[in-house]
Amino acid sequence: DAMLRVIRNHRRASYNAAPEEYEGLTMTPIGIQPEHCPPELFVAARRAWDRALELGTAYGYRNAQVTVIAPTGTIGLVMDCDTTGIEPDFALVKFKKLAGGGYFKIINQSIPTALTTLGYHESQIQDIVNYCVGRHTLQTAPFINHETLRRKGFDDAALARMEGGLAQAFEIQFTFNKYALGESFCREKLGLTDAQLNESNFNMLKALGFTQEEVAAANDYCCGTMTVEGAPHLKAEHLPIFDCANRCGRIGQRYIAVNAHIRMMAAAQPFISGAISKTINMPADATLEEVKSSYLFAWKSMVKAVALYRDGSKLSQPLSA
């Protein structure tokens, strides 16, 4: 009887029933709303719950749960998907920590397609993409480029070694070190001392005479801002389309609100019998009160499971932005 009551309530959610129609619930789920759901999807969902109740009444149930949404964030990377299921992208540009050490730069591949769908021209799209992910070269970058580096002592071989590391770099500073360029080159061609090269926080670009502002400009040109906020041509009303689970890049301020994650889970919950495995990302400055209110909102939304993660709360995390 208890299981049949659960199934009847699931069926009511698929029909978007009124709260008073549910049995034995103090909180009621968010039903499937036909005006926001593809017709074939809600018809299939209703048919599935009709059938579940019909067969369960006749034969009983073997399993308490038969459908769930599995964790898909990391799997999606292996599948070459930007996102899977209801999980939003972590960031437009993110760095995945590798088990053997180091990081791998991952760029959302849907940005150009989305911009095309929104009606932007090819040249505008290229400008926006370059602003976000960079050009992966310093050849003609402002201030720090092949011409200015040659004047500092760089030759073709050194420029090639430096360029080879730019595609996966957090920032251009990571490619200017003795490991990437070679100790002998740094001493003989750049005039740097062993004491400088062995200093743990040595800033080679500063030692070569480049200012912080010049480094920042070259860095944005090469590695991008990692956000579309402030991009040329992009209309303000289109910014929410590119919102991610976290703030994107150094200058990004936008991110998907915590309750928006929960509302998305609540909208998907009526389609499945079990729980949804999904991380609800919170910014690093999230408070205990915000964590508390998020759990309460998830409970009121009849979400069967919820996991919160505050950015930077672990010593090591698989993705960073």
What are the roles of these predicted feature ranges?
Residues 1-321:
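Long, C-terminal-biased catalytic regions of enzyme "large/alpha" subunits
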